[in-house]
Amino acid sequence: MTRKTFTLFDPTLALPAIADAFRKLNPAVQWRNPVMFVVYVGSILTTILWVQALGGQGEAPAGFILAITIWLWFTVLFANFAEALAEGRSKAQAASLRGLKKETWAKKLAEPRFGAQWQMTPAADLRKGDVIVVQAQETIPADGEVIEGVASVDESAITGESAPVIRESGGDFSAVTGGTRVLSDWIVVRVTVNPGETFVDRMIAMVENAKRQKTPNEIALTILLVALTIVFLGVIVTLLPFSMFSVEVAGAGTPISITVLIALLVCLIPTTIAGLLSAIGVAGMSRMMQANVIATSGRAVEAAGDVDVLLMDKTGTITLGNRQASVFLPADGVSEAELADAAQLASLADETPEGRSIVVLAKQRFQLRERDIHALDAHFVHFSAHTRMSGVDMAGRQVRKGAADAIRKHVEALGGKFPASVSGYVDEVARRGSTPLVVADGTRVMGVIELKDIVKGGIKERFAELRKMGIKTVMVTGDNRVTAAAIAAEAGVDDFLSEATPEAKLALIRKYQAEGRLVAMTGDGTNDAPALAQADVAVAMNTGTQAAKEAGNMVDLDSNPTKLIEVVETGKQMLMTRGSLTTFSIANDIAKYFAIIPAAFVTTYPQLAALNVMGLASPASAILSAVIFNALIIVFLIPLALKGVKYRPLGAATLLRQNLAIYGLGGVIVPFIGIKLIDLAIAAVGLA
């Protein structure tokens, strides 16, 4: 997705949002927000009272009722505008995606190989399982998996990243997205989706989903706000008979008017957070989109904020991920050339970067030319997460390469023995933080290949920040325990899972969840799908398999596993924003008590004038100033709701103290200043 940024009140977003704010005045829309629905009903009632006042039957001056009515409607409109503006930012991002859905044609192959006959087919007619060829300067017509070839692909339309990426068969970079463009070479692609199910289609559906589901925390907060509203509604209902009784007993003043009661109710109920609550949720998803992460729901973003365990793959997240074969370490009685020959044979059909680096190293060290895999009449055994080894069966030979324990079991199952010298090499390589791969030819263990990887710069500091936030980091790797321990110590993670299988990952997630923790993880392979489906926050890589994307509740367009940390920070920022604005909204009430209560009852109880600490010009001015402030504060807080409260990697207790000081104390002080300034303005224009 092209990274187009918008200013907060960009005219291209603000003008449609204003129109949407009026459209949202539909009662069918308003009742979804119970607190703002009370304001909506109050606005209708004061409008009726104003019409009565025009006919000479008003309970208060028509001008006063009109002023209150206008600002009550503005309160509703400002809340609608905040939500519409947040939705507009997401819709603008969706519009750029819709531009990718142009009519394209595909070269559909009769057979799944390059060079086979093809026919031009509309992209809309492609079905899951069809095989197509895409050549230089052609647009990839549908989502799919590269099954042959390698090409440079421009994915800027989806990811916003201008640098082309390599997409090739095998490994973790085989997925391609419809709407991207091949810049050079060619690839044969197997289509993985039916029409209407493409990644772009799903992204558009996600960001344009009008009926956004409320998250559990949002529902809980809404219940609290509704409860407060009901309490204040009960208070307001009792004030009218209390006022009538007080006037009769005191023999002075006039009963409080319905208009003033409605104004008091609207000022006391938590309209600020109620008006911004939906906008905060939409903006959270929008911020994820700006980070090139598509969340399937606000629930996923919110869960990210509550996460306290991060499961991260070693390769690509903690290390650079470009492991390369660097050294052949032959077993006793085996020459280095023999080990290189066996390693190359076991890697001929291995399309992963590691497999190719073994073939290249054998060629560089011993001039072993890459052999024609078709001429060998061999059966290749591909790597799986369960066996944790790969290789070739040919001419009575079983050549395998893989993890030390997997090769040990394989050799012993065939009746062979695992040499102590090879175990020593495995431990030595592992202690260096490299990955040892053991090669065996039948029952004969040939030796060890060292795969070197490098821990990413700055990752240790990021993990230290997460630790301050109370988040536990766990590294997941297929490496043996010694290698995993060495890299874990270097990277600074709290724990690690070595020799990981899909079942082990799933069991670890369930263990943490049974302890009451929320778990986040990333994944890109089909073998990651069960764990992704179990995790509370599951970020699938865009380059990953279709199964991984469907199991996750977020998709990272940049396919950067380290993004998981940013996802968690964005989730925490959304929760902090909601909490901070709730605190501010409730703290606002103190100033409004001092403004409206004395104004409402001062004619009956003159002693209440002592509570007019702000020195407001008149009772009418005090009430109107409070109502105006109540409406305007929503507008002033829209930027904070959309941008989010500034997040710092601190402990929960420290963050709570800071936010209570800023938004709690600020919520008490700001209304006193705001209401007084509005009162001065009203007095200056002669409306007091």
UniProtKB/Swiss-Prot annotation:
Transmembrane helix keyword on record = yes
* Major localization class: membrane
Which sites bind Mg(2+)? D524, D528
Where in or outside the cell is it found?
Cell inner membrane
Q: Which UniProt keywords apply?
A: ATP-binding, Cell inner membrane, Cell membrane, Ion transport, Magnesium, Membrane, Metal-binding, Nucleotide-binding, Phosphoprotein, Potassium, Potassium transport, Translocase, Transmembrane, Transmembrane helix, Transport
For this protein, what is the EC number? Answer: 7.2.2.6
Pfam families linked to this entry: E1-E2_ATPase (PF00122), Hydrolase (PF00702)
* Transmembrane residue ranges: 35-55, 62-82, 219-239, 260-280, 594-614, 622-642, 668-688
Instruction: Give the record's GO CC terms.
Output: plasma membrane
Extract the PROSITE patterns matched here: ATPASE_E1_E2
Stored SUPFAM superfamilies: Calcium ATPase, transduction domain A, Calcium ATPase, transmembrane domain M, HAD-like
For this chain, the annotated S-S bridges are none
The residues responsible for catalysis, as annotated, are: D313 (4-aspartylphosphate intermediate)
Complex formation: The system is composed of three essential subunits: KdpA, KdpB and KdpC.
The record's function comment reads: Part of the high-affinity ATP-driven potassium transport (or Kdp) system, which catalyzes the hydrolysis of ATP coupled with the electrogenic transport of potassium into the cytoplasm. This subunit is responsible for energy coupling to the transport system and for the release of the potassium ions to the cytoplasm.
The record's family statement is:
Belongs to the cation transport ATPase (P-type) (TC 3.A.3) family. Type IA subfamily.
Protein name (Swiss-Prot/TrEMBL): Potassium-transporting ATPase ATP-binding subunit
Which source organism does the UniProt entry give? Dechloromonas aromatica (strain RCB)
